[in-house]
Structures are given as structure tokens and as C-alpha cells.
């Protein structure tokens, strides 16, 4: 089955002028990043259909000849870049006509609604107006309102391509107990600066290493009973992060099983991991200091054990060295560097002969 992306024209593929009519070549300007985004979606198997309202097209105020030239040039430019459209559907009515073929109406969609080869679950609609979102709702497909000065909106083309083509592995976990409130958000397919606040600055710094060196977007916000002890905050953060990893990975298709050895001055840390679904943690290392910064060193292996329990991760972690700060940081970095290739998707096969992980 084939997914289709239905796309508005003015304000979505090409920028909309102040008079809302692209009736001259000099008015033709492409929306930023639209071509790379459509190429990515094309490579993901999408076909494209333009669905546009052109108020009074063919009337004296908007002659067809004024529309056709810029429109044909637009299509030729897209085609020169490898982008073709399965169809261009145009409604020429006025808003006051209330024509069923005018968006958000779906009168132009009859043939598509009867086409059983379309993957409607993956299909979507992109436009710059609320009527485009209503059109998507009427088709029961996902709608994206492109961000514009005229009509607002939340999306840009790279974000839309990521959302549709990458099937992004995103998770949001809220863990509330009597002792803590932990919120973890992550996107395994998007790199970004980690946003961490647990009330423990050194622990924050260690968690930042997981996002930065793991190559994924990570946001952790934690409130805990730090006036009593650090234990609950560190443990519950590990559990919430582990749960988020498990949820974002889904059925684990295409992922790998990896290890990484990381030196940090006199310290050497090694992490070997497997998202086997059977949590197990082995730690080899010793700390001389009771705490590093505001983090008790006895809770370092406890954090990793909590992470493994909640994510279904098998982790073997070894560290040796003289400086406890270096050893703790090397543990987090080694885990993150082992996570980076393990989380990367390569194909769609499951890395097991059992049929499930």
C-alpha cells in the first residue's frame, strides 16, 4: 500500500503573496526546505497530490492564463529535482459558494477514497490554514499546519518529513511517587541539546552525557525529596529513563547490540549492552570517595541497575582508574557511546532469530 501526502499549494509549497494570487512569474517563491523534505518523503515511499483552493480561478479577476504559467513553472522545477505529483486538484469556487469540492470539503477526493491501494494510516495533509487541518480531519488522516506569519502553525518542512518518514521513536514518561516527580522526554532519531534538571548538578552533568554522546534529544525534569536523601531522585530517574527507552524503541526492528570502550585520562571504562528484553546489570569498579559533587558514588551502579530494569537492557559496565570523578563520568559516556550505534536503525530486521525482543 502507498501513503499519500496531500499538499496545499499557496503558502505551503510556494510562498503566498499579500494579494493571495500567484498570477505572475515574479511572485513564484518556494517555501524554505520544501524540496529536501519532499525528496526525503519520496524516498520513504510517499506519493504527492496537490489540493488547492483558487478563489474564482478562470474569472476576469483571476484569468486562467495568469495562473497556468507560474503553476507549470513550479511543477517543472519540482520535476527537475526529482519530485513529481500524482495529481493536481484545483477548486475554482468562491468561499461563499460553499462548494463540496472546496477545502475543507472532500468532494475532490472521491476517486482516492475508493482506491484500496492507499495506505491511509500513513497518509497526511500539509497546509498553512485551519481549513487544511479540517480537510485532514474529514479524511481521517494526520494534518500538519505549516508555520506562517499569516496564519500561525507549528510545523516546518524538516519537522514534517521527520515525523512522517522516520516514524520517529519518541517517548514521554511521567513517573510520580510520594517521593519524586520525574518527567522524561526523548527522541531517538533527533540529535539535540540535553535539557536536564534534577536538583543535583553533578548528576545533571552525567545525564547530559547520555543525550550528547548517545546522539539523541533528551529532556529530564525531576523533583525529589532531596532534603531527605538523593536516593529516590537518582533511582526514579533511572527507572523513568529506562521506561522511556523501552517505549521509544518499540519492537526494536533494525537496532544493533554494541559495546564501547572509552578512555578519559588515566581512566578506562567499557560498556557492552544488549536490548534483549532481559534486564541484567554487571558492574566492575570501585570508588574511593563517598560522593562526587552532590552524587553519592554508591548510587552510580544503582542508577544503571534501575535503568536496566526499566528498559530491559543487559549491561556489562567496567571501569578502572584513579580519579573518581573521571571514573563516574567515563561510565556515563561509555554507556552513551555504546547506545549510539545500538539505537541506530539499519534496515527493518529484528536482531534475533526468536522473532521478538
From Swiss-Prot:
What Gene Ontology terms for biological process does this UniProt record contain? Answer: L-histidine biosynthetic process
Keywords (A to Z) from UniProt: Amino-acid biosynthesis, Cytoplasm, Histidine biosynthesis, Hydrolase, Lyase, Magnesium, Metal-binding, Multifunctional enzyme
Q: Which reaction does it catalyse?
A: D-erythro-1-(imidazol-4-yl)glycerol 3-phosphate = 3-(imidazol-4-yl)-2-oxopropyl phosphate + H2O; L-histidinol phosphate + H2O = L-histidinol + phosphate
What's its EC? 3.1.3.15, 4.2.1.19
Renumbered to this chain, region (Histidinol-phosphatase) spans: 1-168
Q: Name the PROSITE patterns for this protein.
A: IGP_DEHYDRATASE_1, IGP_DEHYDRATASE_2
Molecular function as annotated in GO: histidinol-phosphatase activity; imidazoleglycerol-phosphate dehydratase activity; metal ion binding
Q: Which residues bind Mg(2+)?
A: 8, 10, 128
Task: Name the needed cofactors.
Answer: Mg(2+)
| GO cellular component: a single term | cytoplasm
What PANTHER family does this protein's entry cite?
A: IMIDAZOLEGLYCEROL-PHOSPHATE DEHYDRATASE (PTHR23133:SF2), IMIDAZOLEGLYCEROL-PHOSPHATE DEHYDRATASE HIS7 (PTHR23133)
* Protein name, per record: Histidine biosynthesis bifunctional protein HisB
Amino acid at each position: 500500500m502507498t501513503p499519500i501526502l496531500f499538499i496545499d499549494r499557496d503558502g505551503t509549497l510556494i510562498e503566498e503573496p499579500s494579494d493571495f494570487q500567484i498570477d505572475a512569474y515574479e511572485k513564484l517563491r518556494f517555501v524554505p526546505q520544501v524540496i529536501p523534505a519532499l525528496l526525503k518523503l519520496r524516498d520513504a515511499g510517499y506519493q504527492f497530490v496537490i489540493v488547492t483552493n483558487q478563489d474564482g480561478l478562470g474569472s476576469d479577476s483571476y484569468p486562467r492564463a495568469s495562473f497556468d504559467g507560474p503553476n507549470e513553472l513550479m511543477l517543472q522545477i519540482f520535476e527537475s529535482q526529482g519530485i513529481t505529483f500524482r495529481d493536481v486538484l484545483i477548486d475554482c469556487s468562491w468561499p461563499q459558494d460553499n462548494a463540496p469540492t472546496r477545502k475543507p470539503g472532500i468532494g475532490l477526493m472521491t476517486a482516492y477514497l475508493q482506491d484500496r491501494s492507499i495506505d491511509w494510516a500513513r497518509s497526511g495533509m500539509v497546509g498553512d490554514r485551519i481549513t487544511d487541518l479540517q480537510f485532514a480531519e474529514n479524511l481521517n488522516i494526520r494534518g500538519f499546519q505549516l508555520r506562517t506569519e499569516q496564519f500561525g502553525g507549528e510545523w516546518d518542512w524538516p519537522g514534517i518529513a521527520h515525523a512522517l518518514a522516520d516514524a520517529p521513536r519518541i517517548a514521554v514518561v511521567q513517573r510520580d511517587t510520594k517521593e519524586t516527580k520525574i518527567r522524561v522526554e526523548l527522541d531517538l532519531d533527533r540529535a539535540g541539546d540535553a535539557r536536564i534538571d534534577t536538583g543535583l548538578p553533578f548528576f545533571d552533568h552525567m545525564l547530559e552525557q547520555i543525550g550528547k554522546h548517545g546522539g539523541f534529544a533528551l529532556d529530564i525534569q525531576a523533583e525529589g525529596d532531596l532534603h531527605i536523601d538523593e536516593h529516590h531522585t537518582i533511582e526514579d530517574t533511572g527507572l523513568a529513563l529506562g521506561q522511556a527507552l523501552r517505549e521509544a524503541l518499540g519492537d526494536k526492528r533494525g537496532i544493533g547490540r554494541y559495546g564501547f570502550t572509552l578512555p578519559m585520562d588515566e581512566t578506562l571504562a567499557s560498556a557492552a549492552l544488549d536490548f534483549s528484553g532481559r534486564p541484567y546489570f554487571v558492574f566492575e569498579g570501585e570508588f574511593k570517595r563517598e560522593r562526587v559533587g552532590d552524587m553519592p558514588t554508591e548510587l552510580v551502579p544503582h542508577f544503571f541497575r534501575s535503568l536496566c530494569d526499566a528498559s530491559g537492557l543487559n549491561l556489562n559496565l567496567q571501569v578502572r582508574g584513579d580519579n573518581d570523578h573521571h571514573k563516574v563520568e567515563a561510565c556515563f559516556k561509555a554507556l552513551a557511546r555504546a547506545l549510539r550505534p545500538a539505537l541506530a536503525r539499519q534496515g527493518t530486521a529484528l536482531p534475533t532469530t526468536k522473532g521478538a525482543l
